[in-house]
Amino acid sequence: MAFPTAEEITQRVQQIVGPRGLDVEKVDIKKAGAKSAVIIRIDGDQRPDLDVIEELSDEISRNFDAAESDGELNFGAGYRLEVSTPGFDEPLLAARHFRRQRGHIATFVLNQADDEHATANAANARFVARVGALNADETELAVVLPGKKEPSVKTYPLDQIREAKLEVEFSTPPEAEMSLVNTPFDQLG
């Protein structure tokens, strides 16, 4: 039996974290003999704290050990298990990612150039905005664009957003922007 795939690990781990309202965001496998690593990123609408991560890591480890003893999995000569939340540099790709990062600043890359808010270059249309509300069926996202006098809101279908990455923000967000961020999607003008 070969080293388990990322898909096999994702399915197994989702059964453990799902009942806690968490999702498996990413599984990376680095094969290197006895120094192999299985890196699992989990997250939820309520971000798991370190105690929850530790409990889940122990539970996942026990599950993998039992599955290996039963011949269901084979990690070979050994492996290191890492369980954590996604890093700051992970792209926002799904509705749940935007929902969890509401209020944060991100650089957005669109599938095609937009109006004055995006600077089109050879392949990308990019702009910086604050993540706002999603519509009820989570297919459209409102973003809050900083303005010279007042911020404005623009909405995009999620399938028009190729990628969004969070930006580090050291200052307190402007009140006018946060007011728009906290406005429900259906109440935005």
Swiss-Prot record:
One of its GO terms (cellular component) is cytosol. The keyword Cytoplasm applies. The keyword rRNA-binding does not apply. Keywords: Cytoplasm, Ribosome biogenesis. It comes from the Bacteria. Pfam families: RimP_N (PF02576). SUPFAM superfamilies: YhbC-like, N-terminal domain (SSF75420). It is found in: Cytoplasm. One of its GO terms (biological process) is ribosomal small subunit assembly. InterPro entries: Ribosome_maturation_RimP, RimP_N, RimP_N_sf. Required for maturation of 30S ribosomal subunits. Belongs to the RimP family. This is Ribosome maturation factor RimP. It comes from Corynebacterium kroppenstedtii (strain DSM 44385 / JCM 11950 / CIP 105744 / CCUG 35717).
